[in-house]
C-alpha cells in the first residue's frame, strides 16, 4: 500500500518490483543458488531500466535471527536446501520519485516453494 496519491512513475515502479519478485519466487526450489535467484529478479529490474536504483541483495535467510544465510545476492554461490526459509525482497529507490520494496517469506521445498507471507500485493493508496 501507499500513503497518499502517487505519481504514475511510482505506480510503474511498484509493478516492476512486484513482477521481479514474482519471477524470482517462481524460481525458488532446492538446488538453485542465491546468485541465480538474484540474477532473475535483478535482470528484470535492469531490463525495465531501473537497475541503477536497485542497490541491495534480493533477499536472505531467516531463522533465529532476521538476517541469516543463505544470502540471495550477486556473490552467494551456495545452493538452497529444502526446509530453509528465505526472503525475496527486490526494491527500487528513485530520488525525487520514491522507493518500493516488496518482501515475502518463502519456504524452500524440494520441488519449489511455499509463500509464508499472507498479505495483499494489490497496489492501494490510503
Kindly label every feature range from the protein language model:
Residues 1-126:
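Active-site neighborhoods and metal-handling regions in enzymes and metal-associated proteins
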Amino acid at each position: 500500500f501507499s500513503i497518499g496519491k502517487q505519481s504514475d512513475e511510482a505506480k510503474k515502479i511498484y509493478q516492476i518490483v512486484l513482477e521481479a519478485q514474482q519471477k524470482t519466487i517462481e524460481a525458488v526450489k532446492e538446488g538453485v543458488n542465491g546468485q541465480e535467484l538474484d540474477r532473475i529478479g535483478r535482470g528484470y529490474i535492469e531490463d525495465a531500466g531501473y537497475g541503477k536504483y536497485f542497490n541491495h541483495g534480493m533477499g536472505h535467510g531467516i531463522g533465529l535471527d532476521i538476517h541469516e544465510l543463505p544470502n540471495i545476492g550477486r556473490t552467494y554461490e551456495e545452493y538452497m536446501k529444502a526446509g530453509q526459509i528465505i526472503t525475496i525482497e527486490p526494491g527500487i529507490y528513485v530520488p525525487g520519485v520514491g522507493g518500493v520494496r516488496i518482501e515475502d517469506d518463502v519456504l524452500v521445498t524440494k520441488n519449489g516453494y511455499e509463500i509464508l507471507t499472507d498479505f495483499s500485493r494489490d497496489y492501494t493508496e490510503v
